[in-house]
């Protein structure tokens, strides 16, 4: 197979070669942002539907105890981005729907400063994404149904002083700061 598209194909110079997100063993090819962890799971079918693990004691990506579990939904075509926590780690799992989840490392002292990691997650291709503090993260529902995301943050939500910072995904500041478009 050649590495170039023949020049006889109209638009050949605009084409970019696709790179698989996984290698031949199924391992992720992407270089993860420092501190970001991902564990893919799989739905196991049975006669009444299917079952899949969301989190389990002993998984090395779950260093801290679960102190709160909540779910949030996102309507088709809608965004939940960009969020950041100063102290808390998010542990995100897509229980229903189809999401494009992105994480941006804006930490200037990080070895992966400027990196973006992107994941396509769904109930058919589930995974637990652990987002440490000080990383911008968010998602877009790219499916046709309402998506359900389960979060198991390392710190319970503080109603009086939430550790939640928002940079609207469609703001001029986000467009200038984060090199990613949903």
Map each language-model feature to its residues:
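Short, exposed beta-strand "edge-strand" segments with a Pro/Gly-rich flavor and a Y/T-containing core
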Residues: 123-131
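Short beta-strand His + acidic residue motifs that chelate non-heme Fe in jelly-roll/DSBH
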Residues: 129, 137-142
């Amino acid at each position: 197979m050649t590495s170039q598209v023949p020049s006889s194909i109209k638009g050949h110079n605009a084409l970019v070669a696709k790179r698989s997100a996984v290698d031949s063993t199924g391992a992720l090819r992407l270089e993860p942002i420092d501190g970001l962890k991902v564990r893919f799971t799989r739905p196991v079918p049975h006669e009444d539907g299917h079952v899949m693990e969301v989190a389990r004691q002993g998984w090395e990506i779950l260093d801290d105890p679960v102190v709160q579990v909540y779910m949030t939904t996102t309507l088709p075509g809608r965004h939940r981005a960009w969020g950041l926590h100063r102290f808390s780690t998010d542990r995100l799992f897509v229980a229903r729907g189809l999401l494009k989840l992105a994480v941006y490392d804006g930490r200037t002292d990080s070895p992966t400063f400027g990196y973006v990691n992107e994941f396509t997650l769904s109930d058919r291709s589930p995974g637990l994404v652990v987002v440490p503090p000080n990383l911008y993260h968010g998602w877009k529902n790219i499916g046709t149904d309402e998506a359900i995301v389960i979060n198991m943050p390392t710190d319970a939500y503080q109603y009086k002083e939430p550790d939640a910072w928002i940079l609207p995904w469609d703001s001029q500041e986000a467009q200038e700061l984060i090199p990613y478009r949903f």
